[in-house]
């Protein structure tokens, strides 16, 4: 009998691993193992009591979510009762209510609560649970937090109030109405499939993904969403689409998510047959007032408008010599009677002349907006990107945060990894974001963290907040990557509490997404926390920016693209020196845009931190950093260290194979293995570029020294031709081989007999599917297709370059000296079979 009981206990503790697509993200509500629930179920509340819930409101969603979550996590099917505000029975119950209703029914809570808008009180002490929101939305947030504790096996008694750091916590989607006519497809900088909202210029009939998205947003405390691209299509405002907007808002409303829209400033001219869009013209004012009134008729709780104006070709008030504030206030006055707000982006800049030493895109936000401080209406938020340029791998906090004391502001973060690996690379972003949120601007020589400026605390504003460019799509993983969802989760957590710890956040996300196993949690957390420093290491260092191709995909390496154009993301690199001189004394003056204490620090190399040295200073490659290294040697070392870090990710993930469902395990492994290869492409391209430019060798003799490589152009070729690659540093030794038909490349292996890893670096472009076979002495080691576009979501290339460069590896291959290695490639449609090199790597050696 004892043996049987132990066996049953053991079986109950085993949680089966089922295939999962990722659609539920961190809201899986997976059953806890019995070891985590032992001793807690008998005393668990047996019913959910909802006080005075409005129909289809957040309180009703909270009760249904609690029922669903508890049934999934604990296997308990609790009774749910909805009661009016005059009833109060809380014994062994989970009571969920707004504060006013609860206190009216049950008396004052103790201790006295100071709940802000959307805040909540959560108590799990005693035999009952109290989830009390300042409003219905707050109660929903409290319910999700309680379910997070349960999902992590945390049954400890708690009693606390939680308030959001800022009232505005929005998702921004850059979805386009019509993928066929938009410059960047269905979702600009989206890597998780097509839009969940739009199709062929209209709002989709099938909006079934919308409430699922709303649920995810609400679960991390996000209360608003702008559904369309800031490069807005005026046709969103036609009557057909406004009816569709109502349908979207109705689906988000139960989750407490208010819908907002991006506007095209020229809409009165585009849609309204007016001859002007001058914001001070009476006919334009009337057009916007009437249009806004109509929108609020359909969507009475519309969050408001988001406006991108006079930037990157978008129309705006400067066309008519009106100020940006006058442009913002046009919309602010239209939405003010309805309680809406206007978010006006500070991302305004002009094309610049690089020959002008003083020209600097980083100055643009302050140049355009500082003089307008105090001229914006009270319901306007100026939305500021976290850094002065554009979502780079490292930037200083935008100085504009310290230059608008009379204006409410919000920060714009980018969850989608536009410049940071586009979800094909694991890059966990909170450590990057916290370098900005935790930066002290020292306004008037007093403590003034960016996070406290955003909240309104420093300058006394009621309005303030966060915008996260998330860009989910129709892919089951939402963002195109299971691990990238940690960034969406973390964005919500940091918008609620910007002091939250990055490791705590990713560990919570991991438990909810992949389970409680300690090895799973520690492995994913460790990889995640190493990922941003690694990506910075093999992409762009010392504040030089990401060094990606800014003229094409924003994905692979192309450091030359930064310079010799008007975009202003310059490195000013030549054969002797590198970096932007942003000093007041000799440069663009950008350092002087910061408050005095910070400006003095950034003005001098002696007090500028190494990680921003090239952002603020133009120095020789031989300049000695605080670390003691020269700039160029730091580049070499950082790129090799960063790439080496991610080489360890696949092995770490493989150690979890028995603990992760097969579907997600394989999907993540594919991306991590891809990242190991692409990080080497990055490493080699950047180090080779600056080795060529500076003529300074790597002190450790790694750059240009690849003893395990066999260049494809040096093999015996049949059917292949030697081709150029551009940029040249995107190919080892600057050349590749390619064929439109079928070709073979053959060589004899002059290596000691033993076990090796065979790696093939090739190119995978879109618009075709080339096929490959690698053979040893005529026997196939493996076949594959150039079809990575079916597994990866980044912006693909039609060229042989650093975007299309990719690697495949075959481990544990036994080779004898003199063996014949052959690669057979066959082109297909527009894709040539193209090969860069082969590496024959001793076990444990990184190329």
UniProtKB/Swiss-Prot annotation:
Enzyme class at the top of the EC tree: hydrolase
Glycan-linked positions: 52, 238, 321, 353, 586, 692, 740, 767
Superkingdom per UniProt: Eukaryota
InterPro entries: A-glucoronidase_C_sf, Glyco_hydro_67_aGlcAse, Glyco_hydro_67_aGlcAse_N, Glyco_hydro_67_C, Glyco_hydro_67_cat, Glycoside_hydrolase_SF, Hex-like_dom2
Coiled-coil regions, chain positions: none
Signal sequence extent: 1-19
EC number: 3.2.1.139
One of the record's GO cellular component terms: extracellular region
One Pfam assignment: Glyco_hydro_67N
Localization of this protein: Secreted
Chief place of localization: secreted
Reaction(s) the record says it catalyses: an alpha-D-glucuronoside + H2O = D-glucuronate + an alcohol
Keyword Nucleotide-binding: no
Keywords: Carbohydrate metabolism, Glycoprotein, Glycosidase, Hydrolase, Polysaccharide degradation, Secreted, Signal, Xylan degradation
GO MF annotations in UniProt: alpha-glucuronidase activity
One record GO biological process: xylan catabolic process
Family under the similarity heading: Belongs to the glycosyl hydrolase 67 family.
The protein's role, per its UniProt record: Releases 4-O-methylglucuronic acid from xylan.
Protein name in the entry: Alpha-glucuronidase
Species annotation: Hypocrea jecorina
């Amino acid at each position: 009998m004892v043996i049987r009981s132990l066996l049953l206990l053991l079986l109950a503790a085993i949680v089966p691993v089922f295939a999962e697509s990722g659609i539920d993200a961190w809201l899986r509500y997976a059953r806890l193992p019995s070891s985590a629930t032992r001793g807690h179920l008998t005393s668990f509340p047996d019913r959910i009591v909802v006080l005075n819930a409005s129909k289809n409101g957040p309180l009703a969603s909270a009760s249904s979510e609690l029922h669903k979550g508890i049934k999934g996590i604990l296997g308990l099917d609790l009774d749910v009762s909805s009661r009016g505000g005059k009833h109060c029975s809380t014994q062994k119950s989970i009571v969920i209510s707004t504060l006013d209703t609860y206190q009216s029914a049950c008396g004052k809570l103790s201790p006295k609560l100071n709940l802000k808008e959307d805040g909540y009180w959560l108590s799990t002490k005693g035999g009952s649970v109290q989830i009390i929101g300042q409003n219905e939305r707050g109660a929903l947030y409290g319910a999700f937090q309680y379910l997070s504790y349960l999902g992590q096996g945390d049954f400890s008694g708690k009693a606390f109030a939680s308030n959001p750091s800022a009232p505005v916590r929005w998702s921004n989607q850059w979805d386009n109405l019509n993928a066929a006519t938009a410059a960047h497809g269905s979702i600009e900088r989206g890597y998780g499939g097509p839009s969940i909202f739009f199709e062929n210029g209209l709002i989709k009939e099938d909006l079934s993904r919308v409430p699922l998205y709303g649920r995810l947003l609400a679960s991390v405390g996000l209360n608003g969403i702008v559904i369309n691209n800031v490069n807005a299509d005026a046709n969103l405002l036609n009557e057909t689409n406004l009816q569709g907007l109502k349908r979207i808002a109705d689906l988000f409303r139960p989750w407490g998510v208010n819908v907002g829209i991006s506007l095209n400033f020229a809409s009165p001219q585009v849609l309204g047959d007016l001859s002007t869009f001058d914001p001070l013209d009476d006919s334009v004012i009337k057009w916007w007032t009437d249009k806004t009134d109509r929108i609020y008729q359909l969507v009475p709780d519309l969050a408001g408008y988001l406006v991108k104006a006079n930037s990157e070709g978008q129309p705006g008030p400067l066309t008519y010599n009106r100020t940006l504030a006058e442009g913002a206030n046009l919309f602010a006055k239209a939405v003010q009677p309805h309680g809406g707000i206007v978010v006006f982006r500070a991302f305004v800049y002009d094309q610049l002349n690089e020959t002008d030493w003083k020209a600097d895109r980083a100055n643009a936000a302050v140049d355009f907006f500082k003089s307008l401080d105090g001229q914006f209406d009270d319901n306007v938020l100026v939305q500021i990107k976290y850094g002065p340029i554009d979502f780079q791998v490292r930037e200083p906090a935008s100085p504009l945060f310290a230059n608008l004391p009379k204006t409410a502001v919000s920060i714009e973060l980018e969850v989608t990894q536009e410049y940071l690996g586009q979800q094909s690379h694991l890059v966990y972003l909170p450590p990057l974001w916290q370098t900005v949120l935790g930066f002290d601007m020292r306004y008037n020589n007093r403590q003034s963290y960016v996070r406290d400026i955003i909240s309104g605390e420093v300058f006394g504003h009621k309005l303030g907040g966060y915008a996260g460019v998330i860009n989910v799509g129709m892919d089951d993983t939402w963002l195109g990557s299971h691990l990238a969802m940690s960034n969406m989760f973390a964005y919500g957590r940091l918008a609620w509490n910007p002091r939250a710890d990055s490791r705590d956040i990713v560990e919570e996300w991991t438990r909810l997404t992949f389970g409680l196993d300690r090895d799973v949690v520690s492995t994913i957390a460790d990889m995640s926390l190493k990922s941003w420093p690694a990506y910075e290491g093999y992409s762009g260092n010392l504040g030089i920016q990401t060094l990606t191709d800014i003229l094409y995909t924003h994905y692979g390496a192309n450091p030359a693209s930064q310079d010799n154009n008007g975009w202003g993301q310059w490195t000013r690199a030549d054969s002797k020196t590198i970096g932007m001189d942003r000093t007041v004394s000799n440069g663009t003056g950008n350092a002087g845009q910061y408050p005095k204490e910070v400006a003095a620090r950034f003005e001098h190399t002696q007090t500028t931190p190494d990680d921003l040295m090239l952002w603020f200073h133009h120095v020789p490659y031989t300049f000695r950093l605080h670390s003691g290294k020269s700039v160029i040697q730091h580049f070499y070392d950082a790129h090799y260290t960063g790439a080496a870090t991610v080489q360890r990710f696949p092995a770490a993930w493989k150690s979890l194979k028995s603990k992760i469902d097969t579907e997600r395990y394989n999907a993540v492994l594919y991306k991590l293995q891809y990242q190991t290869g692409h990080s080497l492409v990055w490493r080699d391209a950047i180090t080779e570029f600056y080795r060529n430019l500076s003529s300074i060798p790597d002190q450790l003799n790694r750059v240009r020294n690849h003893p395990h490589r066999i260049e494809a152009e040096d093999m015996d070729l049949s059917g292949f031709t030697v081709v150029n690659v551009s940029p040249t540093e995107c190919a080892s030794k600057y050349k590749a081989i390619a064929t439109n038909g079928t070709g073979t490349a053959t060589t004899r292996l002059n290596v000691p007999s033993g076990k090796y890893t065979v790696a093939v670096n090739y190119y995978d472009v879109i618009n075709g599917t080339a096929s490959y076979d690698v053979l040893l002495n005529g026997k196939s080691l493996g076949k594959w297709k150039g079809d990575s576009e079916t597994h990866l979501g980044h912006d693909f290339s039609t060229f042989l370059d650093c975007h299309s460069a990719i690697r495949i590896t075959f481990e544990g291959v036994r080779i004898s000296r003199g063996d014949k290695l052959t690669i057979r490639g066959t082109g297909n449609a527009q894709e040539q079979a193209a090969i860069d090199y082969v590496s024959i790597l001793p076990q444990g050696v990184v190329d």
